[in-house]
Amino acid sequence: MLYNHITELIGNTPLLRIDPAVHQLANVEVYAKLETYNPFGSLKDRVAWGILKDEIELIVEKQQTIIEFSSGNTGKALAVLASLYGINYETITNRIKVPEVHDMLRLMGASIEVLPGMSECPDPNDPNDPLSYLEQKVHANPSRYFHTDQYRNAKNYQAHYEHTGQEIFADLGAVDYFFGALGTAGSTRGVSTFLKERYADLQTIGVVAEKGDFIPGLRNVDEMSEVGIFDKALYQDILTVDAQDALSGMLALISQSGVLGGPSSGAVYYAMLQYLKQQSQGWTGPKKVVFIVCDRVEWYLSYIQKRRPELFEQKVPEDSFWKLKADDFKQAPSIAPEQVERFLREEDPLIVDTRGSLAYKIGHVPNSINIPDDKLADILTFGIPFPHERTILFVCPKGDISKKFAFFLQRKGYKAYSLEGGMIQWRKNHQQLLRSPA
């Protein structure tokens, strides 16, 4: 089939029926919308082109720089499109956690500016947040930049309303259940709105990451409230998945269906199957279920290798930090803000700030040391660098990630705690912050 431009390949992705012998659900037909078939590898190709297609000629004429807050698939798609049209692309982020994504953006000529966010998600009330910084940058020089604004731009979900949803309906007609990952919420909002207009009984189920866990492309339920195009009323349920279960779902998709989806796709697949096992009991007629396969597994090999090293024939302890599941650390001991001063005075703990180095330099708890969470997790896989006789207090942006470290060390016999509410609560309480010298 002949095409004249790469953008003509965006959309019209296949819909794959999952063999009932694989999912083993009675009276259920499961279909995977394979967004991996988009030319740049993910469902975000639709969003990037949907935002740019009516503006690109003017952007080129003005020689503007496309700018976005992205550390993933939207950034990759925008970088390719900018390169095709001979213009610059700049991404603002507070940390790119997947090395392959960083390398790919560099390969495609993107300019990457890494900023210290107090949180790993957009916070419009925080002037240090990357999204707020980006908006200030654009406002200061509006003629220079074109801000695609994926978190609030209606064209994000319109791309899925006008295309993805229509494609699914053209193939299947009425759909009973639709499952999707929640990041910007554009795909679930657009698809579900289109499908629900044609079948009012559609059930839309969103999937988020467990608090304190990291699944590329997914946010946790608290972070979703900070995404402008997220509308909670559209969802009949929102399911939570941790990284280990997401990888189990991903591996099942790969090995049993030949679908090379990444961790976010695995999260949706795992959550969907667990949910339908309960819901489908007693169904007498067939139900049609659709889920989105967001992107490909190859982007995330380093992420997978850390969490499932045995797949790569690497030997690590069975109780590795990366093997922790969400239920393990929910009850991890925390120090409440009103208890902090007394705790610091009586325990004299070693304070370990697990945020990125830039965030630490801008403001940190006095006498704390900085070991970013991804580095600390790697270190703990092979040993514990802290003295056993010393009490340890872990600090992170919101008090979620620090719980994992506190639980892990408590299990090893250490006195370890998490700062409840993290640095965000510390700042709200106007407690002392130190700034590192430049």
Predicted regions and their residues:
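Short, basic/hydrophobic alpha-helical segments
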Residues: I384-F386
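PLP-dependent amino-acid enzyme catalytic core
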Residues: M1-R342, E347-L350, G356-D374, D378-F382, ...
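Mid-chain, well-packed structural core segment of small domains
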Residues: L393-K398
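Generic C-terminal helix-cap and adjacent flexible tail
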Residues: H430-A438
